[in-house]
Amino acid sequence: MGRAIGFDREKYIELQSEHINARRKEIGGKLYLEMGGKLFDDMHASRVLPGFTPDNKIAMLERIKDDVEILVCINAKDIERQKMRGDLGILYEDDVLRLVDVFRDRGFLVNNIVMTQLEDGNSQAEAFIERLERLGLTVARHRIIPGYPANIDLIVSEDGLGKNDYVETTRDLVVVTAPGPGSGKLATALSQVYHENLRGVPAGYAKFETFPIWNLPLDHPVNLAYEAATVDLNDANVIDHFHLSAHGESTVNYNRDVEAFPLLKSLLERLTGTVPYQSPTDMGVNMVGFCITDDEVCREASQQEIIRRYFKTLVEEARNGLDTTQSERAAVVMAKAGIKSTDRPVVLPARQKAEETQGPAAALQLHDGTIITGRTSPLLGCSAAALLNALKHLAGIDDELHLLSPESIEPIQTLKTKHLGSQNPRLHTDEVLIALSVSAAKDENARRALDALKELQGCDVHTTTILGSVDEGIFRNLGVLVTSDPVFARKSALYQKR
């Protein structure tokens, strides 16, 4: 039994590419299209809109790629703070390189990187710029503009956007993207419009922001899931009062777009003498809302995503010794959605197993609703146990049968503790999978269990203690959606190995 589908992927590709082409014709000249969210690997969208694939947006752009040039932004401050893409477990700066490779592999033109919010003394950002230039990429430096976005007189001047490097592009549709939010995509697009018009090149701006979905209600779980995903930015969905005033229609946008709209309107007025947009919603080209085929499926998926985001904030606060600001914001979003953390089906079974066994435990929900649990034993960690139990269930193997015998596990434990310096003899998920792969050469049951791995894609897991980076990474690679209680397995330890 697979995951329920609530979104029409093919309709989206067709409708969205047509709408972008229509906007290009309306604007005339060069169009800078800010791509909100992730252009590639949009895991969030695929979780809250079942049927939307992580590469949906890039597949849509492939329809018109001969007219497209990609411009990738990265915020210098994100390099300094070593910000990571949580869904992929890589640094933003590494993701810039990955994105360039992915775009080029799919036949897109991408030669330029924009370093935003660059300040003197940011040595890490400058080192990354040098690295990019050695790789043959052109890097534009964009500075912090005091008073952005409120000080319009300064922004639209030689001392504002005029101080930014101009990026020379060769195509009429320039897609501005980034590893994640807060990277400066809007400012980059506006800077380019400013510089193009100085050079006598007609240029305009439009925005493709998947979330919030403008034609869904403000409190729809899909839109609330976006708020939960951006608690670190303190973003909030709001009614677009500009659109309501201009068109008498209530639509949803997010606070930073609404706040920045007067800047965009003023910029376009000063540059071209005309204002094509009366509201932030007018700026957008998003057709996602028209491609939802089952609202209830998307509501349920989004509610589960909100809960996952809540647990994620709790774990990050525990790991990094942070205050509770972000988890409190996430809790507010849960309250708006009318849900609680235990509405995640795997939470209570994991906690009940932990209480029964007096040790860390895990619970995994299969696509048919079956809950599989795993306990901590002298041989296996709870995540590894739950993984093996799930594979046995999926492969139709008797629960009493050992896929890995104690005799096969003990040499691995000896290697870990006596030769590799580990204090924890229990096998992690990666070690279990390697052992299972070795066994599969001669054991039919092990072979069947390995074949069942693909059925874990999109399943949910909850653990009663914070996972280490190894188990977290294995689950991520398998496409399993993991949450944890904000408790360390060794509560008394000051240094918690990740």
From Swiss-Prot:
Taxonomy, superkingdom: Bacteria
Family annotation (Pfam families): DUF1846, DUF1846_C
Name this polypeptide is given: UPF0371 protein cauri_2449
InterPro entries, per database record: DUF1846, DUF1846_C, DUF1846_N
Family the UniProt entry places it in: Belongs to the UPF0371 family.
NCBIfam families (UniProt xref): PRK13663.1
Gene3D superfamilies assigned to the protein according to its UniProt record, in alphabetical order: dip2346 domain like, Domain of unknown function (DUF1846), C-terminal subdomain
Native species: Corynebacterium aurimucosum (strain ATCC 700975 / DSM 44827 / CIP 107346 / CN-1)
